[in-house]
Amino acid sequence: MKVLLDTCAVIWATLSPNSLSPQARETIADEANTILVSAASAWEIATKVRLGKLPGAEKLEQDYLAVMEEAGYELLAIDTASALRAGRLTAEHKDPFDRMIAAQALALDVAILSSDPQLDQFGVRRIW
C-alpha cells in the first residue's frame, strides 16, 4: 500500500516516534508499504524552522534529504497539476501545505497518514 505522510507525521516519525499512534507506527514500519513524503512537507518544515515555530527540528531541516533517504521514504515533487488541484479544492481549510498534500493524495489515490481531522474535509482517506 502507498501512504502519504502529512508534515506532522514526518516530524514525529523522525524526531519523536512515540508521538505517532500505534497504527501509524505499524503502517510506517511495514516494509510492504511505500511511504511517500511531499515536497510540501520540506517546504513547511523549512518555513517553520525559519520562523522559530518548530524548535528542535533544525537538524531535521538541515539534513532533510539524508533523513528521508535513510528512512526509505519516496519523495514527491510538487507538479503543476497538483498545484492547480490544491487551489481548486473547495474545502475551507486554508493551510497551503495541507491543501497540497491533500491534492497529491487525491491525485495518487492514496491515504494520508495524519492525526489532523481537518484533512477529512478534502475527502481524502486518512490513517491514524
Model segments located where?
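Short, well-structured N-terminal submotif of metal-dependent ribonuclease cores
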Residues: 1-38, 51-66, 70, 108, ...
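Generic structural signal for small/hydrophobic residues in well-ordered secondary structure
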Residues: 7-8, 45, 86, 105
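Alpha-helix capping/helix-boundary segments
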Residues: 9, 41-42, 82, 101, ...
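Residue-level signal for well-ordered alpha-helical positions
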Residues: 16-17, 48, 89, 125
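Short, conserved active-site loops that position catalytic residues or coordinate cofactors/metal ions
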Residues: 39-47
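Active-site neighborhoods of divalent-metal-dependent phosphate/nucleic-acid chemistry enzymes
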Residues: 55-65, 69-115
